[in-house]
Amino acid sequence: MQTVEFPYRSSSHLILLHVVAESGAWEKHGLDVNYDYKIGSEDAQAGINSGELAFCGGNHVSTYGLRARGSKWVYLGQTVNNVYHSLVVRPDSGINSVRDIRGKKLGGVGSHPILNNWLYLKQRGLDQDRGDYELVMQEEYKPGTMDPTEPEKKLPPLWHWVRDGKVDAAFVGMPSSLFAKAAGLKVIDVEPLPMIQFSSISTNLDFVERHPDLVERFMKGLLEGIAFFKTRPDKAIEIIQRRYTKAGQMTREQAALTHRSLDSVLEAKMFPTMKAIANVYQEALRHDPDDAARVNPMELWNVHHLRRLDDQGFIDGLYGNQRAAAHRHDGAVDQLNTE
């Protein structure tokens, strides 16, 4: 069994990764994937560049500037192309839609979700730089990086800040929105944001060229794990309820809703969408305006491994009589991303 490092940038990825691991898909391909630990943005960059890490499940924003500075970071696939979130407010807040955030305090946590909030609201006429609303962050970030200054600091769920009156509103996804609703807060459905987020398959181009067999086995295992998630819902829900407790202990019903929300946006074939890439690139330009502007965002995407597997019929074959495309719908997924 070959050990492979695949740390996450956000614990929300574990909703999927626990299921993939327990499905036995990676083991089937001779891989012992060490996925259940978090890594900072700068540590991920160093590990991928040195080859200490085979893969990383994230770093979505800072990598475009890195590419301009000589990094060989590449993305091999994308599990989710949209942020499906809800707006959580107090029942007496007077907030009934996104436009009502004007003049209010918006809570934020995680360097990438905060950028998502900025872009989402700007696309809807609310500009943070113009002072249309006040962003209140749960943590500070090292200048020029996506990493918090105190990475070990214990933070309360963001919806607690709404409940306790520290902020007027916050964007959250499942299962956080379920816990917020159960606590009596108002949960408002809003439009999704096309975005590269959740588990991206990140690695180094030199690693890919040196280890094509390992890359193929890893990708096959992940694709098979996604198929298990989609076609074995009862088992997947049981794993989610038992294993994913980072945001709180879910009931069976909450685990089922969380599964359904992720299943509905989980990409069976792991191809990125152009809208998602375009939006994350806008965030890269905000984060690193000079260097990111020197890069065509498509330079970082290398999906020929996926394309070959798809052309061979491997992915559709995982779904029997149903094509894999039939397993991509509309829904809601948490945006507990860090980057």
What spans do the regions from the language model cover?
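Predominant activation on well-ordered alpha-helical scaffold segments within soluble catalytic domains
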Residues: 18, 64, 114, 118, ...
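Short, glycine-/small- and polar/acidic-enriched structural segments
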Residues: 1-154, 158, 164, 168-174, ...
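Short linear loop/turn motifs
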Residues: 34, 42, 133-136, 255-263, ...
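Conserved C-terminal helix/tail region of periplasmic/extracytoplasmic solute-binding proteins
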Residues: 285-339
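Short secondary-structure transition/capping segments
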Residues: 46-48, 68-70, 87-88, 181-184, ...
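Pocket-lining segment of extracytoplasmic ligand-binding domains
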Residues: 145-246
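Secondary-structure end/capping motifs
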Residues: 211-293
